[in-house]
Amino acid sequence: MAGSNIKVQIEKQLSERILLIDGGMGTMIQGYKFEEKDYRGGRFNQWHCDLKGNNDLLVLSQPQIIRDIHEAYLEAGADILETNTFNATTIAMADYDMESLSEEINFEAAKLAREVADKWTEKTPNKPRYVAGVLGPTNRTCSISPDVNDPGFRNVSFDELVEAYSESTRALIRGGSDLILIETIFDTLNAKACSFAVESVFEELGITLPVMISGTITDASGRTLSGQTTEAFYNALRHVKPISFGLNCALGPDELREYVSELSRISECYVSAHPNAGLPNAFGEYDLSPEDMAEHVAEWASSGFLNLIGGCCGTTPEHIRQMALVVEGVKPRQLPELPVACRLSGLEPLTIEKDSLFINVGERTNVTGSARFKRLIKEELYDEALSVAQEQVENGAQIIDINMDEGMLDAEACMVRFLNLCASEPEISKVPVMVDSSKWEVIEAGLKCIQGKGIVNSISLKEGKEKFVHQAKLIRRYGAAVIVMAFDEVGQADTRERKIEICTNAYNILVDEVGFPPEDIIFDPNIFAVATGIDEHNNYAVDFIEAVGDIKRTLPHAMISGGVSNVSFSFRGNNYVREAIHAVFLYHCFKNGMDMGIVNAGQLEIYDNVPEDLREAVEDVVLNRRDDSTERLLDIATEYLERAVGKVEDKSALEWRDWPVEKRLEHSLVKGITEFIVEDTEEARINAERPIEVIEGPLMDGMNVVGDLFGEGKMFLPQVVKSARVMKQAVAHLEPFINASKEVGATNGKILLATVKGDVHDIGKNIVGVVLQCNNYEIIDLGVMVSCETILKVAKEENVDIIGLSGLITPSLDEMVHVAKEMERQGFDLPLLIGGATTSKAHTAVKIEQNYSQPVVYVNNASRAVGVCTSLLSNELKPSFVEKLDIDYERVREQHSRKQPRTKPVTLEVARANKVAIDWASYTPPVPLKPGVHIFDNFDVSTLRNYIDWTPFFMTWSLVGKYPKILEHEEVGEEAKRLFKDANDLLDRVEKEGLLKARGMCALFPASSVGDDIEVYTDESRTTVAKVLHNLRQQTEKPKGFNYCLSDYIAPKESGKNDWIGGFAVTGGIGERELADEYKANGDDYNAIMIQAVADRLAEAFAEYLHEKVRKEIWGYSPNETLSNDDLIREKYQGIRPAPGYPACPEHTEKGALWELMNVEESIGMSLTSSYAMWPGASVSGMYFSHPDSRYFAIAQIQQDQAESYADRKGWNMLEAEKWLGPNLN
């Protein structure tokens, strides 16, 4: 069957059911207890060496036995037979001096399996059987030395592996294989050689078969033998585009589960697993019975991990039979829709997504850029050269660039030697490698040494399209990303226009002709030196910065890199000024979208730390702001050079040692100076009442400064790494004193609290924690966005008595269900508490409680927490408490099952026919006075205070009543007054001391409605759609009203009316988390919660203020509006500002569209979690509608037809749609 046809057929099968791979071939052969004569058969009776153990030879010497084993597995229910060729490569066959038989063995093995499979397909045509031609790992490793005394030595080369695998692949295809299975991969470089061979043979034969890949996690470390994590391994081989990616061998199902689970999450293709029958016992035998193994498989299948399942060592046809029984009828894993990202790896993964921070590529392992490194390589001092690479990684390099291009070096040999040595150093090889050379043969030699997914630096069009395409195809086959220089046959691009022209041409060739993934294309638009004295060079930096923005906008998913030090080449010898130029240049490049840069990771200056006079002079040069900018910088550079060489005393370098100790500590943290940290920390400890105060005070203050600079793009990862190192030294000095002062006492119990993965909200959780602590419970608070794995791991390690989960947004409900299921699966016997704004007793009873056999208690407020915990941990109270709980939940479930919608549901067609009736012909939408994006940075807190709605503030503290009446309430009035005063005192401090920062933005875009959705355009020509905002429509019977949808309030495209829509995002919480943590560390939980509550109020106030400003000034459709704050709270204005996740648009992922439209994260630092919660937590976002008839409404329940329509418009499968629409889907 042709390759394309077989792929289609197998994919159809995989979409419908879980397919079964066969089990252990070696296990079955061992059951025959063959002796030497059996292996020889008749043909090899006179062979000159022992053949016992050569199982692959049996296809020639005992073919009937292999046929019988295949038959047994197909009879048991297997869909896919593996050929008996695990060790049939020439390399593995060399152990028996049988290299010459490799081709014949592969051919005969495939032919035999083909005959058996066809026989069974003929028996049961509705269940076709397939043959997977097996390519095993060989008995050698391409990335590990077999000689402990020479870590750079290899007993097999990439090319030798390619040759061996090519011969086997040709024979397997000729013998009739339907698929190629690269399995039991313990060294990913071997597998990369194998995949290279397979793809080369496909090209040679003009046929492409589906490829299956299966790796081996060797032990509890969760890594392959060559050291890669599961995700790093996946990233390294993802370029093969296999039909399935899986794991097999080494571990039993219990040990392998977490890695199969991880693979099912990250793999864009189908997932396979064929584990061993447990771990071998003391006699090397496997004890896990077919029934027990099937139990594990059933759980994997029901958890949605699997598309293919089979067995490896110790498994038999009976194991496969039992697996077939438990997976029959179970829905196979659905392929996830993952964001487009460049997925690199060393021993560990590096995923570069749209929202990733700047990636630092270490430049010092380059003989052309580092005199020290060049000397070490020339003198063959490779151990010392490795230390240069390690320093780069320790200083924050996430990728290391390696270049050996020097006239007196054998660049190819040096590259191979150094990369092989790097592979033996986990602290270096954990990061991806950038193979850098101007010589193609050196690049190829380097690619043959790296097991992860690296980057080629670089190729270009300078020698024409044909060579460019040839090299790009090979790079893709080697499994690397590529840097493309802006260079063609005319020359290097030196202007903005030329940079765009060349990069666009290269992009189109790579994507359209080569099939290169756009996310793996990294453009280097050429960084040239500025301030050279030549006028034509003055705009080089500006051209690069602007080209970065152009490329990011016009070439989807492509990334930008560059050699940063080039820009300062005119000032070589004056490192101080060079570092200042780098800091300023990077700051502006990063703001415009530059993804990565080749830098000296140990010597990056912080933008804000560049002296103001120097920074201004540098910016004049970089941004070409003055005609005399070069001369001015040269003048000031001389002064800084003299300081650097000691001719002029730099007083500022000495002054800081005379500052107060708190300021000295901050300075050391920001600058990454370790020289004085111990003596300054000791001085601070002597001055403090308690040693812990040194950490909570000056050390945390300094780290907050580092965090702010990093978040603002004025400080890069290497500096943060150095700051963290300084902090660790300070804490290490204090730890003995802190431990000596600790007192331990008895508690009422230990409770773990966590806000679940993807959710950032924790005010309620923090209040619960404080209340419980006041009642002598020990609290372990894991904070926000905590994964299930972390929660359960810590719960076991700390031996807690209760686990409490919190969440505010609706996606958190599914995560809570997941945690409950995992607790049941792992055999926990602890009570589980559920709380948070999005939770309810009904959801707890219907969705969570039934997945966990221990008590699951919905706690609706902090006041209940103590009573609940006391009952659950009391032997006397627990039985009756749990009995009442069970009765209550059963009642809730019965009520839920009988629950009928208050209004009758209607079809989507009927709902759309009853849309809001607006006479668009007689209405002209208002045109904004100031369209586009508006940013409000460090906004004045005093202004926002006038817009605060205080009623929800009191609700946070469980004081119910409307402001201002609550201040006079008979029962809670006095407490409310105290709270109100404390909040305003804190706001005074916030305002005076700048404790919190408020940032916000809004934008107004041309828009039209198209059905239930809204098209947002890039500009007023309305020709290009920037984004589509998807909406839901009410879907219940409305005899006297409309079935509302937000799109009803935007003029339909066909009306010819030019309408607009707005978006906004605001936060009052920048700095809030740090303040709250500081208060907590100081034991001040009251103010920790207070600062969060105040930050939330500021965010809502900012939203109110900004909406008013939009109505009156920016959009300007209500210029004469005069409303009091009470009127604003009552929404007496024209227009609405609905927010994704709330009743009118309850689906959270639409926040992502807003973020992209307005470039929110880069503009004001607000980000979204995996569940689309906003960070910081004290944040608000939404849309602006201006129509006078617009109003708020609730979508409530929708039906399956609308869910299908929404999924189709969003490009989702129904699994994804059900995940996000679940709370509203009837």
Curated annotation (Swiss-Prot):
First-level EC class: transferase
> What positions does the entry give for S-adenosyl-L-methionine binding?
949, 1137, 1192-1193
Q: Where is the B12-binding N-terminal domain?
A: 652-746
Using the record's annotation, list all stretches that form the B12-binding domain: 748-883
What's the name of its gene? metH
Upper lineage is: Bacteria, Pseudomonadati, Pseudomonadota, Gammaproteobacteria, Vibrionales
CDD domains attached to this UniProt entry? methionine_synthase_B12_BD, MeTr
Record note on cofactor: Binds 1 zinc ion per subunit.
* The organism of origin for this protein: Aliivibrio fischeri
Q: The AdoMet activation domain covers which part of the protein?
A: 899-1226
Locate the Hcy-binding domain: which residues? Answer: 7-327
| Database matches in InterPro entries | Cbl-bd_cap, Cobalamin-bd, Cobalamin-bd_sf, Dihydropteroate_synth-like_sf, HCY_dom, HCY_dom_sf, Met_Synthase/Corrinoid, Met_synthase_B12-bd
Q: Name its pathway.
A: Amino-acid biosynthesis; L-methionine biosynthesis via de novo pathway; L-methionine from L-homocysteine (MetH route): step 1/1
| Residue sites binding methylcob(III)alamin per the record | 696, 758-762, 806, 810, 862
Q: Which GO terms describe its molecular function?
A: cobalamin binding; methionine synthase activity; zinc ion binding
> What Gene Ontology terms for biological process does this UniProt record contain?
homocysteine metabolic process; methylation; tetrahydrofolate metabolic process
Domain notes for this protein = Modular enzyme with four functionally distinct domains. The isolated Hcy-binding domain catalyzes methyl transfer from free methylcobalamin to homocysteine. The Hcy-binding domain in association with the pterin-binding domain catalyzes the methylation of cob(I)alamin by methyltetrahydrofolate and the methylation of homocysteine. The B12-binding domain binds the cofactor. The AdoMet activation domain binds S-adenosyl-L-methionine. Under aerobic conditions cob(I)alamin can be converted to inactive cob(II)alamin.
From the Swiss-Prot or TrEMBL record, give the protein name: Methionine synthase
